[in-house]
Regions:
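SIR2/sirtuin-family catalytic core signature
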Residues: 1-20, 26-29, 41, 45, ...
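Short N-terminal helix/helix-N-cap motif within the alpha/beta-hydrolase-1
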Residues: 20-21, 250
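Short aromatic-enriched loop/helix-cap "lid" or pocket-rim segments at secondary-structure transitions
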Residues: 22-24, 278-279
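Extended, H/D-rich, highly charged conserved domains that either
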Residues: 45-323
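TIR-domain catalytic/interaction hotspot
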Residues: 316-336
Length: 429
């Protein structure tokens, strides 16, 4: 790259936080939340007993119950892309499905377990038993939550309300008749809030230790920015697109890092500076505005599932608070100023389909096919980028190009022009 100027877009995913020592994966959150229920590698049996004995107070959301079932089926989610894929498959198991009643949603789980049976009678009976267990836990959870809502609506005190008096069939029907996607979205909000509290505490703890998270983030950002770039970090103009909820770079005390950081956009929301506990109604003040979701690229118009897409949910997020010097800036300002963007550097992102729309828009904006922009997919030892994921991303983007011949030869063109590289930061000279 030129030694005179360097405009870059740096895309960071959860692998960035992980490389900085933050326990931010779904697997780490799940273990923190449910480890106490695990007996012999299984969670559901003791979780069911706990709900029946103590109620739902310690269970953040319905989604945690669904993911607990995946855990017991030996299909854990080590990465957020797997969680978001599960959300998509659960809500929208096949294209063209216009929402679900609760009964049909339960049916998805019935198929999930039966599909795992290997054809023998014993396997089928075991799958049926597991499915019934999940359904029972889910209905118990929903029934108790509905009972609490009824108490609030009627002004009764919880201690005077007998859950055993609840009409099971009426309660179940109330949720079937209600807008089930809305209920599931409300539950997803609770799941997001609970993860936000967990992550906030993890950041606090990481920065209290000598091996500080913010310091690691500054160092890693500097390594990414200076990789294959002759311009020192202080003279770069970098736009950071973060798929994380943390903002260690915005909190940086390193003058060179701050001068290079033109703007940072946290795509899926940010943690507040202070996280409070829930009030008596279960609300947080200030609220935690972070989102999980599914990609809306192929979601049919008018489909109730679209409310779960990241694009739709991002519209409801409050505007990100930025330092005064960053206000009014835009990621593609160099292009609007008649300059070029020399590099797009991706670090720590799984490249899963849940975020495809963002990469599609980014590649369109920089005119990937015709421009001179170089794509870097960078990683550190132990946090490797999967070449197949890079190929899949570019192949899918190529399908959108016209004429079609451009799309078919996109990856070859980038390689011939030396405009795509997968590299280990630890091996930089």
């Amino acid at each position: 790259m030129s030694s005179d100027s360097c405009n870059q877009i740096i895309v960071i995913g959860n692998g960035f936080d992980k490389a900085c020592g933050l326990p931010s994966s779904y697997g780490e959150y799940f273990n923190d939340r449910f480890q106490k229920y695990e007996v012999g590698g299984k969670i559901l049996p003791s979780l069911q007993k706990a709900i029946e004995k103590e109620g739902i107070g310690d269970i953040p959301s319905l989604w945690d119950l669904l993911f607990a079932a995946f855990h017991d089926e030996e299909t854990p989610f080590p990465r957020w892309m797997d969680v978001e894929s599960a959300i998509r498959n659960y809500l929208w198991p096949s294209a063209g499905v216009n929402g679900h009643s609760f009964d049909s949603t339960i049916g998805v789980w019935r198929k999930f377990f039966i599909k795992r049976a290997q054809g023998t009678y014993e396997d089928f009976q075991q799958a049926k038993k597991q499915q019934n267990q999940v359904e029972r836990i889910m209905m118990k959870y929903i029934s108790q939550k509905h009972a609490v809502e009824m108490v609030h609506q009627t002004g009764q005190k919880s201690k005077d309300y007998n859950l055993d008096d609840l009409n099971w069939s009426e309660t179940r029907q109330a949720f079937i008749d209600d807008d089930t996607p809305k209920m599931l979205l409300d539950e997803l909000n609770r799941f997001e809030e609970d993860f936000g509290i967990y992550l906030y505490k993890a950041v606090e703890l990481a920065n209290e230790n000598d091996d500080k998270y913010n310091s690691h983030a500054e160092h890693l950002y500097r390594c990414i920015g200076e990789y294959d770039c002759l311009v020192p970090i202080a003279r770069q103009r970098n736009s950071v697109v973060s798929f994380n909820y943390t903002t260690p770079l915005l909190d940086s005390v390193d003058d060179e890092v701050m001068s290079s950081l033109y703007i940072e956009q946290n795509v899926h929301g940010t943690l507040p500076k202070v996280v409070s506990q829930r009030d008596l109604l279960g609300d947080l003040d200030p609220p935690i505005n972070i989102i999980f979701g599914i990609d809306g690229y192929e979601a049919p118009k008018g489909n109730r599932v679209r409310r779960f897409t990241k694009t739709a949910r991002k519209l409801s997020l409050p505007r990100q608070e930025l330092p005064n010097r960053m206000r009014g800036r835009r990621m593609f300002d160099p292009l609007y100023d008649g300059e070029s963007i020399q590099a797009v550097k991706v670090y720590g992102h799984s490249l899963g389909e849940a975020d495809y729309s963002y990469f599609h828009a980014l590649f369109d904006q920089i005119d990937l096919y015709e421009s001179d922009t170089v794509l870097y997919f960078l990683y550190s030892t132990g946090h490797e980028t999967i070449p197949e994921a890079v190929g899949d991303l570019l192949d899918r983007y190529g399908e959108s190009l016209r004429p079609k011949a451009h799309g078919k030869n996109l990856l070859h063109k980038l390689m011939m022009e030396d405009r795509i590289r997968i590299a280990n930061l630890d091996e930089q000279n």
